[in-house]
């Protein structure tokens, strides 16, 4: 299993998603979705090569669809760096 970390952009994306969830769906649903995203982070860390490469986004990146969002990440040695969480992409 790899360790994972969020870069600044991904942290901002996560905050935006949570705030949107609260305003649109209320706190309980926002927390459930927030937990789902962290479950996706754990799945990525468990086997980061399981998910496809994101050639159209950036070379060396991979992605994982999580709910209506797409998590973009890259693998650096024994660590996964979560780069961005983007809303509704077609891949």
Language model features by range: what are they?
Residues 1-55:
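Basic, Lys/Arg-enriched alpha-helical interface segments
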Residues 56-63:
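Short, hydrophobic/aromatic-rich segments at coil-to-beta transitions
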Residues 40, 64-66:
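Generic recognition of cysteine residues
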Residues 66-91:
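Enriched for short, Lys/Arg-rich terminal
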């Amino acid at each position: 299993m790899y360790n994972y970390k969020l870069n600044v952009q991904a942290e901002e994306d996560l905050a935006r998603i949570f705030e949107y969830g609260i305003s649109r769906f209320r706190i309980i649903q926002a927390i459930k979705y927030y937990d789902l995203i962290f479950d996706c982070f754990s799945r990525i860390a468990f086997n980061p090569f399981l998910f496809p490469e994101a050639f159209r986004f950036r070379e060396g990146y991979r992605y994982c669809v999580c709910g209506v969002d797409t998590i973009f990440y890259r693998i650096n040695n024994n660590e996964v760096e979560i780069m961005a969480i983007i809303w509704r992409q077609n891949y």
